[in-house]
């Protein structure tokens, strides 16, 4: 701040551990481990493809993440809360309706509808995002809340991954103050050219209250991202 810079806290909401499902490797004080050891809360944490995740469909999980964001805003002089692009993991046609939080989906009122699991999962993410936004604004109205989703909109709207409703976020003041898509490709990328992807995001944003910032990865400069050397 003394140098005129804004500082935001970057959070990754659902991931507990990557590359391991061994709960004993977590601290004994880790809530994910405590939840796993209790039959009543065991499904608050899910193992999937070698990693551990908080279950997006559980209210206790949502409360934990919201309170974490609120704690940061209350105790640290940050200008914003910035959520990373990791939401639901990726499924496929054989397990999309049976893996991960499918049990919670089937037990919900939406579980009676064929293929409703996509809407169900998006609903869980929306509930979390809206709750974080409300908590941040209630704590310090001047602190912003934004999300940095993956850059390719088609991937975000897939029925197999993420389950983020970016169109709703971009056109409502109840979810985010800004969206910062990670457009980490060059102008010569074979299917995600920087200018085309950027224009698509700008076209999707219709609310004047939600800003769109383009996320550029400086660390990829000079690497093969589909850009010519002159464009790097």
Model-identified regions with their sequence ranges:
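Generic structural signal for well-ordered alpha-helices
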Residues: 1, 69-73, 125-134, 166-167, ...
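Acidic (Asp/Glu)-rich catalytic clusters
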Residues: 1-4, 170-174, 199-209
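Aromatic-lined carbohydrate-recognition surfaces of secreted/lumenal glycan-active proteins
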Residues: 5-18, 82-89, 114-162, 209-221
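Active-site-adjacent "subsite" loops/lids of carbohydrate-active enzymes
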Residues: 6-75
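Active-site-proximal loop/short-helix segments
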Residues: 16-29, 75-116
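The substrate-binding groove and active-site-proximal loops of carbohydrate-active enzymes
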Residues: 47-66, 111-125, 181-188, 220-227
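Substrate-binding cleft/loops of secretory-pathway carbohydrate-active enzymes
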Residues: 138-139, 144-180, 185-197, 224-225
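Surface-exposed substrate-engagement region within the catalytic domains
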Residues: 188-232
């Amino acid at each position: 701040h003394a140098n005129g810079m804004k500082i935001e806290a970057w959070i990754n909401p659902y991931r507990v551990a990557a590359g391991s499902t061994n709960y004993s490797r977590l601290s004994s004080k880790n809530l994910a481990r405590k939840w796993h050891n209790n039959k009543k809360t065991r499904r608050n944490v899910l193992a999937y493809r070698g990693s551990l995740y908080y279950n997006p469909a559980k209210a206790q999980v949502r409360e934990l993440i919201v309170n974490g964001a609120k704690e940061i805003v209350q105790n640290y002089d940050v200008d914003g809360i910035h959520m990373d692009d990791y939401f639901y993991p990726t499924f496929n046609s054989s397990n999309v309706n049976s893996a991960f939080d499918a049990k919670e989906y089937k037990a919900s009122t939406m579980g009676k509808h064929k293929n409703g699991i996509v809407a169900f999962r998006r609903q869980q993410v929306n509930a979390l995002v809206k709750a974080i936004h409300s908590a941040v604004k209630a704590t310090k109205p001047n602190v912003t809340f934004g999300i940095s989703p993956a850059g390719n909109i088609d991937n975000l709207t897939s029925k197999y991954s993420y389950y983020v409703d970016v169109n709703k976020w971009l056109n409502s003041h109840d979810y985010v103050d800004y969206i910062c898509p990670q457009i980490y490709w060059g102008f010569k990328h074979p299917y995600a050219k920087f200018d085309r992807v950027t224009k698509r995001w700008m076209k999707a944003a219709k609310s004047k209250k939600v800003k769109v910032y383009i996320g550029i990865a400086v660390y990829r400069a000079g690497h093969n991202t589909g850009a010519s050397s002159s464009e790097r």
